[in-house]
């Protein structure tokens, strides 16, 4: 008699997509430690080889959130600024700078993240370096959002079930669905998201998954130069999402050209930081209204896109203009001293 796991593996071996109930069973068994290492590795590689679908990724999100420490009780719209990583760039932590700038402008930000993946300084490293609290409980998150419009949710603290997955990921040593899953698992369930991907082919997969998991408004971004953020290096390819929170909505493809906003192109070296200390110093400069011009331009592009999502009716050119003014005024620095 076939077990559920053997049925799942046989389905993947034939190159077929998993039905929702099979996907849910597979991810539940994986996260509960009920698969052997051989089964877990076969499961993850089978998904990768055939190509993960939005429905399969959605079932992975649901299984992970069912086992997560959830954060509730934050009223009104909230946003997360996050990327999949894997762009191979040691760029400054633009997502954290964007999040803090938005918080300084009065928007509620619940940033979910971890240590560095492809940069010199990951979101958690940056938050820690700026002196902001890292090890938070749900009550702390609610209090900090009320106090300063910003809280950081350190992923390992909120996803204990991932301890069953990490050894398998390390042994495999290759990209799996879990490289995409992290940005989708914010336990505070923000209504808005600015999500970056390092590969353009991931745009529809991630956008459709956000829609299915209940996000109301989002932009999934692939930046010029292969970055998982908008950059001054050239036009960004973007999928805009308008959802009803119940899995239904529309997706629209757009392109955003920095030249339209008076931004000069730059090189990857002008966006890079060599180490954590430099990364934190640059962040402080940017949040105070200074910093290197190419990094400031990149920050403006991402803040502007997020404002376009958060403020209904705010056209993108007006959002970019508002972002420029906020950066010049050092809006993000207010959060550090709240």
Swiss-Prot record:
Chain segments annotated as transmembrane: none
Natural source organism: Nitratidesulfovibrio vulgaris (strain DSM 19637 / Miyazaki F) (Desulfovibrio vulgaris)
Cofactor(s) the protein requires to work: Mg(2+)
Superkingdom, taxonomy of origin: Bacteria
Gene3D superfamilies: Nucleoside phosphorylase/phosphoribosyltransferase catalytic domain, Transferase, Pyrimidine Nucleoside Phosphorylase, Chain C
Name used for this protein in its record: Anthranilate phosphoribosyltransferase
Record-linked Pfam families: Glycos_trans_3N, Glycos_transf_3
Subunit structure: Homodimer.
Binding residues for Mg(2+) 1: 95, 229
GO BP annotations, alphabetical order: L-tryptophan biosynthetic process
UniProt binding sites for anthranilate 1: 83, 114
Function: Catalyzes the transfer of the phosphoribosyl group of 5-phosphorylribose-1-pyrophosphate (PRPP) to anthranilate to yield N-(5'-phosphoribosyl)-anthranilate (PRA).
Annotated positions binding Mg(2+) 2: 228-229
Pathway recorded for this protein: Amino-acid biosynthesis; L-tryptophan biosynthesis; L-tryptophan from chorismate: step 2/5
EC identifiers of the protein: 2.4.2.18
Membership in a protein family: Belongs to the anthranilate phosphoribosyltransferase family.
């Amino acid at each position: 008699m076939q077990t559920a796991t053997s049925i799942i593996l046989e389905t993947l071996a034939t190159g077929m997509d998993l039905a929702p109930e099979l996907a849910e069973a597979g991810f539940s068994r994986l996260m509960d430690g009920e698969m052997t290492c051989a089964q877990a590795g076969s499961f993850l590689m089978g998904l990768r080889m055939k190509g993960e679908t939005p429905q399969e990724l959605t079932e992975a999100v649901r299984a992970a959130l069912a086992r997560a420490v959830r954060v509730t009780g934050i009223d009104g719209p909230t946003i997360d600024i996050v990327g999949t990583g894997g762009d191979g760039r040691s760029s400054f932590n633009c997502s954290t700078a964007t999040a803090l700038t938005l918080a300084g402008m009065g928007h509620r930000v619940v940033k979910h993240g971890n240590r560095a993946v492809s940069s010199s300084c990951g979101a958690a490293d940056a938050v820690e370096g700026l002196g902001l609290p890292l090890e938070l409980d749900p009550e702390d998150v609610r209090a900090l959002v009320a106090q300063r419009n910003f809280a950081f949710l350190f992923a390992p603290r909120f996803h204990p079930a991932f301890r069953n997955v990490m050894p398998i990921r390390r042994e495999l040593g290759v990209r799996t669905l879990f490289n995409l899953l992290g940005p989708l698992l914010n336990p505070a369930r923000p209504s808005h998201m600015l999500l970056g991907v390092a590969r353009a082919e991931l745009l529809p997969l991630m956008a459709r998954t956000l829609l299915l998991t209940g996000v109301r408004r989002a932009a999934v971004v692939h930046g010029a130069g292969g970055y998982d953020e908008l950059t001054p290096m050239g036009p960004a390819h973007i999928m805009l999402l308008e959802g009803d929170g119940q899995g239904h909505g529309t997706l629209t493809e757009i392109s955003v050209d920095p030249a339209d906003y008076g931004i000069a192109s730059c090189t990857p070296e002008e966006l890079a930081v060599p180490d954590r200390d430099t990364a934190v110093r640059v962040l402080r400069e940017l949040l105070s209204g200074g910093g290197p011009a190419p990094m400031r331009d990149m920050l403006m592009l991402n803040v502007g896109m997020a404002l376009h999502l958060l403020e209904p009716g705010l056209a993108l050119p007006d959002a970019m203009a508002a972002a420029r003014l906020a950066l010049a005024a050092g809006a993000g620095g207010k959060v550090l001293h709240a």
